[in-house]
Curated annotation (Swiss-Prot):
PANTHER family: TRNA THREONYLCARBAMOYLADENOSINE BIOSYNTHESIS PROTEIN TSAE. It holds the Pfam family TsaE. InterPro entries: P-loop_NTPase (IPR027417), T6A_TsaE (IPR003442). The keyword Cell cycle does not apply. This is tRNA threonylcarbamoyladenosine biosynthesis protein TsaE. GO terms for biological process: tRNA threonylcarbamoyladenosine modification. Mg(2+) binds at T47, E121. Belongs to the TsaE family.
Length: 161
């Protein structure tokens, strides 16, 4: 797979392995404090992309959708590298006024958000609570196909205090 700029880009992923590889390429460039928002319809490959990010970050644990627990912490295998906090806010979609930071704090995560990479599924409109900027990755399914179209760009929040 070609080199990708973390700044912005687009790619066609024809197979699941391509989506994992894209996540890995982008994940190699992420740093502690970064927030990544994964958007797209159900079954678009958000969790698959998160698996690729986890591979690049070399974190522990299987990456599965944290829909029912809201967040999972994947600790780093190497000292001096960030953990990955995998968040799925699908359950909060009907509660747009939900205090996401408060919800995450209530989980008593063992990792400080500023010292980890936060990968958030369904986080559009909520990521601004966590960071002044975030990497927005959008996955679209091609109808009647396994093909996905991925686009990404950094987004700055002007409304964040």
């Amino acid at each position: 797979m070609a080199e990708y700029s973390l700044r912005s880009g687009a790619v066609i992923c024809e197979r699941v392995e391509d989506t994992v590889a894209l996540g890995s390429r982008l994940g190699e460039q992420l740093r502690a404090g970064d927030v990544v928002v994964l958007s797209g319809p159900l079954g678009a490959g958000k969790t698959v992309l998160a698996k690729g990010i986890a591979v690049a970050m070399d974190v522990d644990g299987p990456v599965i959708s944290p829909t029912y627990v809201l967040a999972r912490v994947h600790l780093p295998r190497r000292l001096g590298t960030p953990a990955m906090i995998h968040v799925d806010v699908y359950r909060l979609l009907d509660h747009r006024d939900a205090d996401l930071v408060g919800e995450l704090d209530s989980l008593d995560l063992d990792t400080d958000l500023a010292e980890a990479v936060v990968v958030m599924e369904w986080g559009a409109g909520l990521a601004e609570c966590l960071a002044a900027r975030h990497l927005d990755i959008r996955l679209e399914r091609v109808r009647y196909s396994d093909v996905r179209i991925a686009t990404w760009q950094w987004v700055c929040s002007r409304d964040r205090p």
